[in-house]
Amino acid sequence: MTEVTYQIQDQIKQFNNFNPIQKTNYKYQYNSDNENSSLVYLIKNPKQNNFKNYNNKICNYKRSLSSSSFQGNEEKETRKKNKAQFYENDFENGFGNISSWLNNSIPYKCEDCNGNNEPPHQKLKSQDIPLFTFFEPLTFIHEINKVIHIELEIAGVDKDDVKVDLTNNILTIVAKKKSVYPLFQNMCEFKRHEKSIGVYKRVLEFNSNTVDKDTIKARYVNGILLITVNKFL
């Protein structure tokens, strides 16, 4: 044997490890020529008590395993096509239309800008979700060293449109969310309208004689309203 493929070597090792009873049912014959190597198995069929001859042609290749008759170029191309088809069809079908999912998830008015309110997935009338509405901002409250810290998310408003009032132990925060195109509203042609305008409002009530209203401070940073007020000692 001048050049034996590693696959055939493994098969021969496996045969040599058979017990005597197994060796009576299996025989191997090795043939070699310039181009191909073949391993002939004689497998005994216990039901018919005869032998079936299985001839497995193995292309002669070296350690790199660059070519094999078990996976020719045609089979490789078929696998590539099947893989591409999986990503083009099964993946897309499994997750559905992403744009439709996003449109269905939007909790405000989607206005198609040619004058009608009918996105591709459904018809959404103007009275269903008004453009002007009230928002209750998300609030985070904590206390450090007798100082109450309040954070509210009110993105999209100008700091001059934020009003904070503390009267009779009731803290009221109001912020108006204006349109970004007030001067051009009647002139421009909208391609899509998914933004509502309105008012942020949050009312917090403290226990009587708990906070000192003269110590209240507020600042607006990156869409977050920060309020601090001292408690009575």
UniProtKB/Swiss-Prot annotation:
Cysteines engaged in disulfide bonds, as pairs: none
Annotated coiled-coil segments of the chain: none
Highest taxon of source: Eukaryota
InterPro entries in UniProt: A-crystallin/Hsp20_dom, HSP20-like_chaperone
UniProtKB keywords: Stress response
Protein family (similarity comment): Belongs to the small heat shock protein (HSP20) family.
The protein's name in its UniProt record: Small heat shock protein hspF
Organism of derivation: Dictyostelium discoideum
Species classification: Eukaryota, Amoebozoa, Evosea, Eumycetozoa, Dictyostelia
